[in-house]
Structures are given as structure tokens and as C-alpha cells.
Amino acid sequence: MRSKFKDEHPFEKRKAEAERIRQKYADRIPVICEKVEKSDIATIDKKKYLVPADLTVGQFVYVIRKRIKLSPEKAIFIFVDEVLPPTAALMSSIYEEHKDEDGFLYITYSGENTFGGFETA
């Protein structure tokens, strides 16, 4: 999936920003979170997050649910490289495995399981 954030900000600027963030906040992960384009789920109010390294994927999903004011009965799926990461995985391990060459971790979310793949822990 194409990232609007990548389209709007040149690579060098993104890379410099991610490096600055990692130097200043070594225990945090720079994350860009965007909605899957064709999803009918609400659009999030901010794309950039500074996530504690010891946060789990499940806890991050909870943060996203709160930001988009998603009701409990509605489903949300998050994807990293078009794969559903394990809920219990730490954001730090997801970051190490999937960070972009610019230093950000790109996460997309949807109201439906758009891609269908699961990552095994």
C-alpha cells in the first residue's frame, strides 16, 4: 500500500526526523499509522506516534481504537507490510523486523481483514 506520509515528505527529511527521534527518545518507536485507502473505517486524526518500545501490538491497537472512537463491537485490523502482526508482539520487535529504510515503522489499519495474511510468532 502506498503511504500518503511518504508521498508528502521526501525521504531525506523522513530519515533525518526518524534519526533525531531515536536519538532523543531511545526507548520509543517512531510510527506512522494510516488508514487502508478503501476501508470504510474512520480516518485517524494524527498519523505520527512515538510509541514506547515495550508496548504490545494489542495495546497499540487499543490506542488506535480510542483515537478513531471505534465502538467495541466493531473490528479493527492493523497491518505491517500487509501482514497482521501477533497481538502479543512487542512494538520494538515489530520495529526491528519491519522498519522502513527511512527509520519509521509504517502501520496501516482497516475495518476488515484486507490482506488476509497472518504473521506467526
Swiss-Prot record:
- Record keyword Transferase present: no
- For site (Cleavage), what residue positions does UniProt give? 116-117
- Which Pfam family is an annotated match for this chain, by its short name? ATG8
According to the record, what induces this protein's expression?
Expression is positively regulated by idi-4.
Keywords, comma-separated and alphabetical: Autophagy, Cytoplasmic vesicle, Lipoprotein, Membrane, Protein transport, Transport, Ubl conjugation pathway, Vacuole
Give the matching PANTHER family.
MICROTUBULE-ASSOCIATED PROTEINS 1A/1B LIGHT CHAIN 3-RELATED
Q: What name is this protein filed under?
A: Autophagy-related protein 8
Q: Which organism is it from?
A: Podospora anserina
* Organismal lineage: Eukaryota, Fungi, Dikarya, Ascomycota, Pezizomycotina
